Amino acid sequence: MREPVILCVSANPGMDRRLRMKSLVVGSINRASSAEGFAGGKAAHVAMAAHALLAKSVWIAFLGGPIGEECVTQMESLGVRVVSMPSSAPTRVNLEIIDDSGQITEILEPGGAPAASEAQEFLQRCRREIENAGESGLLAISGRLPSGVGADLYVSLIEAARANGLPSFIDSSGEALRLSVEAKPQFVKVNRQEAEDLIGKAVQTTPEAVSAAQEIIRRGAARVAITLGSEGLIWVEANDGPVWKAKPPQLQVVSAVGSGDATLAGFARAATLGITGEDAIRLAAACGAANCSAIAPGRIELATVKSLLPQIEVQRL
């Protein structure tokens, strides 16, 4: 059997620029004590985390300019295969500012608009990668779409995956998420805010999160996970399937940026290994927790994940 491959699609990647400083003062000059740059964007985080879990991961991304080239270099150095699709728009930079108190401020640049011909070529290349992956593969679509790209791009990819026997996992927001859910993906992963925006109701408690997941299932998804920050996550399956909640232990957090993406990587890896139920959500939660102490978003370590597995509290609701 062909080794399963996890295709991580990134239509709007970026460079994660992490700045550390004593404190951030708005309206004043702020000097950083250190600065680091990491290949980023949600799908990049998924690809790196999946690779750490010994999965064969492929990162398919719009990339432009010197920053895009640096992202390719970094991802390839980690062992991730990169399918770089040229974009006339320079790859964006996302700032993550960490002060001495541990407070994190994120400033995310908008993604530049690729040309219409570039968007079409991106879609066609994704379809070829889906066809080449075979039925043992998995499609993971993460992040927002760049300006100028139709909200139905992800729908086309979900349909291509279905036609080739691949399950599709989606983590997005806004109109792209709404349309993707209606396209009936196998799995949807959203955070609390994204769930609230999608269904138009509050998602503050566990019962509300379960209700939101069930509503997303009614709209088309087969399985839904909603991440709830330090409270963990819930996972609901269609057809009156089991409802699970997982909660990680209290941790020393460096940064939670990318933890939802690492969680998605855990679910994706579980799917390619045939792991289901309690063991799947335990692995996903351990990946999300491991990301909190990682050197950069998505760069989890397998040893850390393994050490966290027995510490994850899993409950069937």
Report the location of each language-model feature.
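Conserved phosphate-binding/catalytic region of the ribokinase-like
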Residues: 178, 206-317
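Short beta-strands and strand-loop turn motifs
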Residues: 106-108, 136-144, 171, 189-194
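Glycine-rich beta-alpha junction loops
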Residues: 11-15, 63-64, 89, 194, ...
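Conserved phosphate/ATP/ADP-binding segment of small-molecule kinases
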Residues: 152-243
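Conserved N-terminal subdomain of the carbohydrate kinase-like
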Residues: 52-137, 307-317
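Glycine-rich phosphate/adenosyl-contacting loop at the front of the ribokinase-like
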Residues: 1-60, 69-70, 252, 317
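Gly/Ala-rich phosphate-binding loop of Rossmann-like dinucleotide-binding domains
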Residues: 51, 162, 272
